[in-house]
């Protein structure tokens, strides 16, 4: 297997915390920066602080613009780029709302904590009244539930919604978010092309129960902490790399030395770590395999296990990530080392195809030609074949 490049850090780079733009639950804050002369500098600061850059506006992303931009101030959806500079200068995460553009008249110094004495302008009053839900809000709610609700009781409890309110994905209170989901959005994921909700087996029963007594199911305890999903293909960590050859080394068998590294990505699907060589069979060859054929599982040598451990530790050190996050990245890239490294660095695979998601893993199990052809069109025949082999092992 090709050796991983030397992992060094630029001594002249930014010095602020590498987790400055990471939330308390471990998820990275997403930022969209409007084109400007300061975009490159801001991008460097955001990425060094553990944040994620989005190429397009998306639900949940913090929209950044420079003060004075008419369109940004008119919309009221943008945060001043000064927020990033102040966070870096103080090396702490500041309050976003103090930097929102265009909603209220602000003092000349927008920094939090600035004295308001002597100002003739009255203190801005809190927003009152009911805030209407937009399609973007609904998508943000459904996406958050899909990625964070780990059990049917999560959506009827309060912990999930309080956490969502704290994440500032929308401007609504947690009570309003919960009511919106239970009464209007639950079971409607297909209308937003989001696939099935993770709690769909009991959704109708829970909906009836929640409408009768929404507070009854609140356990008061947060759900088990889960490593957040890595950003989708339109969110990139830096500039996109040029396409290269996909590495044919896969990680597939478990290594006890690294401890438990199971990622709950799809039913009966655990990621195991080792390496195997050779190209996988094509989907056609795979479909011709007889069900009664038994293949002897290849044994893993101590040297291969040691190499796998070394590589994963290097990935963890290089990208400053924990074992669970690196393991999840390997899982989403079918264990391909080069693709995983490229994805962690730039947010994209070198072959240009997207990473695998839970819904497509479920579709891969269906015995349906149309579904399989759609997956081949989306991921490429070779990647589909590799995914099938990866799931088998």
Curated annotation (Swiss-Prot):
Residues with N-acetylalanine modification: 2
Gene: Terf2ip
Entry similarity comment: Belongs to the RAP1 family.
Sequence motif: Nuclear localization signal, positions: 377-393
Residue positions where Phosphoserine is found in the record: 36, 43, 151, 153, 200, 203
GO cellular component, one term: chromosome, telomeric region
Recorded superkingdom: Eukaryota
Source organism phylogeny: Eukaryota, Metazoa, Chordata, Craniata, Vertebrata
Residue ranges annotated for the Myb-like domain, each copy included: 125-185
Source species of the chain: Rattus norvegicus (Rat)
Cross-link (Glycyl lysine isopeptide (Lys-Gly) (interchain with G-Cter in SUMO2)): 111, 191, 205, 209, 237, 366
Stated name of the protein: Telomeric repeat-binding factor 2-interacting protein 1
């Amino acid at each position: 297997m090709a050796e991983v490049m030397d992992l060094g850090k630029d001594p002249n780079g930014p010095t602020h915390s590498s987790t400055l733009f990471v939330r308390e639950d471990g998820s990275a804050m997403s930022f969209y920066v409007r084109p400007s002369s300061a975009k490159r500098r801001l991008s460097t600061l955001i990425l060094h602080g553990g944040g994620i850059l989005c190429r397009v506006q998306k639900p949940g992303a913090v929209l950044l613009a420079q003060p004075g931009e008419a369109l940004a101030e008119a919309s009221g959806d943008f945060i001043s780029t000064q927020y990033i500079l102040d966070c870096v200068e103080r090396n702490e995460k500041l309050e976003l709302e103090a930097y929102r553009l265009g909603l209220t008249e602000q003092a000349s110094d927008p920094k939090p904590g600035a004295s308001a004495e002597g100002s003739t302008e009255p203190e801005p009053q809190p927003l009152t009244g009911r805030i209407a839900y937009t399609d973007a809000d609904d998508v943000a709610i459904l996406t958050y539930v899909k990625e964070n609700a780990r059990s049917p009781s999560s959506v009827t409890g309060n912990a999930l919604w309080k956490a969502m309110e704290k994440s500032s994905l929308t401007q609504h209170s947690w009570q309003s978010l919960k009511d919106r989901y239970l009464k209007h959005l639950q079971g409607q994921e297909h209308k937003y092309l989001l696939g099935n909700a993770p709690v769909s087996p009991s959704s109708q029963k829970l909906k009836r129960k929640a409408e009768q007594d929404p507070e009854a199911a609140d356990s008061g305890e947060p759900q088990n902490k889960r490593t957040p999903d890595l950003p989708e293909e339109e969110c990139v960590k830096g500039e996109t790399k040029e396409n290269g050859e996909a590495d044919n080394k896969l990680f597939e068998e478990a290594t006890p030395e690294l401890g438990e590294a199971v990622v709950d990505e799809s039913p009966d699907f655990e990621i195991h770590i080792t390496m195997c060589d050779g190209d996988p069979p094509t989907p056609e060859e795979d479909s011709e395999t007889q069900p009664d054929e038994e293949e002897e599982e290849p044994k893993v040598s101590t040297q291969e296990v040691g190499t796998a451990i070394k590589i994963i530790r290097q990935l963890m050190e290089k990208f400053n990530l924990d074992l669970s996050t690196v393991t999840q990245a390997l899982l989403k890239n079918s264990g391909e080392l080069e693709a995983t490294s490229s994805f962690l660095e730039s947010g994209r695979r070198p072959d240009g195809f997207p990473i695998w998601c839970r819904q497509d893993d479920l579709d891969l199990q269906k015995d349906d030609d149309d579904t399989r052809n759609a997956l081949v069109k989306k991921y490429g025949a070779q990647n589909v074949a590799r995914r099938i082999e990866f799931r088998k092992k």
